[in-house]
């Protein structure tokens, strides 16, 4: 039997509340579960009451082979109960093709403007030097 530590939705419409449960992977999301391990209230602001988890029971089920889902693994990582691997997606941080084109155009425009200012500053100096001779 494949066990999952996952979220079971409770609460009413537009007011979600989740229970952290251990359940068979084949059972429905809000269906039968083996044990309730805690809760998550996403509507609360960031405080200690937002996520509540029974650490001893989580350790017990992890030692028995229960696999946490991604969201639950985030909670367990914050609580120091499980280690979440860092994702390596370096292309995600790079700007898109259009943004790169816009940045190149902006850089070229700034360089042209700087060159024009330098040329304008040099022109009166040359005129002054020519009149002084």
Curated annotation (Swiss-Prot):
Skewed-composition ranges (Basic and acidic residues): 83-101
Q: Which UniProt keywords apply?
A: Ribonucleoprotein, Ribosomal protein
Q: Which InterPro entries is this protein grouped with?
A: Ribosomal_bS16, Ribosomal_bS16_dom_sf
GO BP term, pick one? translation
* Entry GO CC: cytoplasm; small ribosomal subunit
Q: Where is this region: Disordered?
A: 83-102
Q: Which GO terms describe its molecular function?
A: structural constituent of ribosome
Family according to the record: Belongs to the bacterial ribosomal protein bS16 family.
Q: What is this protein called?
A: Small ribosomal subunit protein bS16
- The organism encoding this protein is Mesorhizobium japonicum (strain LMG 29417 / CECT 9101 / MAFF 303099)
Point out the gene that encodes the protein.
Answer: rpsP
């Amino acid at each position: 039997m494949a066990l999952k530590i996952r979220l079971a939705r409770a609460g009413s419409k537009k007011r979600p509340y989740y229970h952290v449960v251990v359940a068979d992977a084949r059972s429905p999301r809000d269906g039968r579960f083996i044990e309730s391990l805690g809760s998550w209230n996403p509507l609360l602001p960031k405080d200690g009451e937002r996520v509540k988890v029974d650490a001893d029971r989580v350790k017990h089920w992890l030692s028995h082979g229960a696999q946490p889902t991604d969201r639950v693994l985030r909670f367990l990582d914050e609580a120091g109960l499980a280690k979440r691997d860092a994702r390596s997606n370096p292309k995600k941080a790079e700007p898109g093709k259009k943004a790169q084109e816009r940045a190149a155009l902006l850089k070229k425009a700034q360089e042209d403007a700087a060159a024009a200012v330098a040329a304008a500053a040099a022109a009166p100096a040359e005129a002054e030097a020519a009149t002084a001779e």
